[in-house]
Amino acid sequence: MKLRLKVPQWHYSLLTDYERLAIFKNAIERVVDEDDVVFDLGTGSGILAMIAAKKAKKVYAIELDPFTYDYAKENIKVNGFNNIEIIEGDASTYNFKEKADVVIAELLDTALIIEPQVKVMNSIIERGFLKEDVKIIPAKAISTIQLVEAKMSHIYYDEDIKSEEVSEEVIYEEVDFHKTNPIEVSYNIELELEKSCENLGIKLRTYTILDDKHVAGQTSMLNPPLVIPLNKKVDKGRVKINLSYRRGGDLESIKVNLG
């Protein structure tokens, strides 16, 4: 599948994350049928909408940012997709003309803390825009927690800077996008700290379940591991943690307390 695309500068990294694009493409091509109505929520460059439109009867592609919307509109026109309706608007408030057979919503980030995936999907569900047998891509997100020796005193993504892992990695939440989910969350977690740490931190990872055949881990532009330092010296042994944050908020909403 060859497409001609123009994108804002900040979208180049998304388009060149081929691992991320490939797994979404594979899931979309597997899930979408020829009679389907598809919503692409937060369409960005429009690339996922165009992949869906190769098979779907109709695709509604919505983008909040007016600058990005202009690029998506041009991309869809240049590539000759007459079955895509491009919309400038907020997916959480826009009134769609019909219900969706398939929803694509790549509004993802680590632990769903910053991006509005949960808020948008809650709104679509609550306002009755989904058919009973709707297929959602991604279907779920699973997040894990692990203790680390933090390398910095502020929140950072554990990419170029690797933090020493000092506990097992455990699942602390599973979010199913077929149902409404809370915006404010709080978790009590107990982990075994394998060695004493000068600056204990927690590392969060998110694994994206696109459908029953496709699972995405971390890629260069999808859910990089996030480290939250506690800036405390903690001795080896059992560690009780309370982790809370606001989904679709910002990193400042994260609160971590030792029990």
Curated annotation (Swiss-Prot):
Family: To M.thermoautotrophicum MTH738.
GO molecular function terms attached to this record: protein-arginine N-methyltransferase activity
InterPro entries recorded: Arg_MeTrfase, SAM-dependent_MTases_sf, UCP006607_RNA_methylase-rel
Entry-linked CDD domains: AdoMet_MTases (cd02440)
Annotated protein name in UniProt: Uncharacterized protein MJ1452
